[in-house]
Amino acid sequence: GGTVLASKLAINYGISCNTAGGSHHANYNGGAGYCVFNDVAVAAHYLLNRGLANKILIVDLDVHQGNGNSEIFKENRSVFTFSMHSKTNYPAKKSNSDLDVELEDNLEDDAYIKTLKHYLNELNQENFDFVFYIAGVDIHFNDRLGKLKISDEGIKSRDELIVENFFSKRIPFCGVLGGGYNKDFNKLVKLHLSLIHIS
């Protein structure tokens, strides 16, 4: 419900965020990887079925591949799935997104942002009319389940890049939190707040 509401607010106001969501491993037939229901998939179907969007982009920057979304939408040309994730992390067997970018272990800020900019330029050639952004902070260097080495500032730069890229094009934008398993709970909250503050 939260991501459906957030997507409706994004249609009305241009940008919104759900302070949860991003359960991108759940599929039609059940949950997986700490994800019970795939909120982004439900919200995307809601928008499409009501004619509120015609071409949706899912930008998934969680450290884990968004295999649930890639499976759910693999035959749906109205939804484009983009996942940039750790090559060696969960799930062991990856699904095929419309665009997958696999990152090597221990990747740091500069290479991460450079890679993201490159693929954003490709995505900007398409005519999307709605964007979901899964802003997992498990790319952080201190995350228990991540394998990348992205700093606090790197996460802030990532979120700024994504929000500014689509907001400047006046494409309705809905952000959700995604994964985060930092050993320090207060740090985890601060990292997730990056998206909220920027939006």
Where do the language-model regions lie?
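A general "terminal functional-core" signal
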Residues: 1-199
